[in-house]
Amino acid sequence: MKKILVALMATAMLMAGCAPKTPAASTPAPAASTPAPAASTPAPAATKIGTASIVNVKGANYNTADKKDGTAQSDVTMCTVMLDDAGKITYVNFDVTQSKFAFNDKGELTTDLTKGVISKKELGANYGMAKVSEIKKEWFEQIAAYEQWLIGKTVDEAVAMKTFEKDASHKEVPDVAELKTSVTIDIGGYRNALVKAAANAK
């Protein structure tokens, strides 16, 4: 009897040792991650830059009766403009210098030419327009409002701006709602300088 039990136990152990082992469940390796494509940066718009200046000279002769010096004034309106590839204005800057000269009856200059000329923008509040302006704004504030209005517009759109004649000295004042309370200066000379600067843009 013992021999039979021993034989049965040996057979069971042998069968257990020969039974196929169930392989451990393998964890699949994580799939290689595909990097997300980098966000494409749009190519910058092509830009052209142009500058121009317009000179206007006026004056008065020497007054022989009063022996008053003659005068001459040179007003130079300057414009720098940047245009994108669609022809729209992305940057614009205006400034003006007013050079005044005096001369005597011999035609000799009596003005001190060693003094530099300060532009309207450089003068800032010292230009003194606010005290005589109906909107109480200085020249630099008004030209800044006009410059801002031009951004995003084409030169043709700038030229097409409606204007009105306020008086003999202000024949081209902006007649658009956005500038009614910010610009009362004559923009004719600035508009002409803009057209010239845009034509020079490269």
Regions found by a protein language model. Give the residues of each.
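Bacterial lipoprotein signal-peptidase II cleavage site
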Residues: 16-30
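Active-site- and interface-proximal helix/loop "cap" or "latch" segments in soluble metabolic
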Residues: 44-202
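Sec-dependent bacterial lipoprotein signal peptides
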Residues: 1-16
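Alpha-helix boundary/interfacial micro-motifs
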Residues: 3, 19, 103-104
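Intrinsically disordered, low-complexity segments enriched in glycine/proline and serine/threonine
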Residues: 5-6, 24, 125
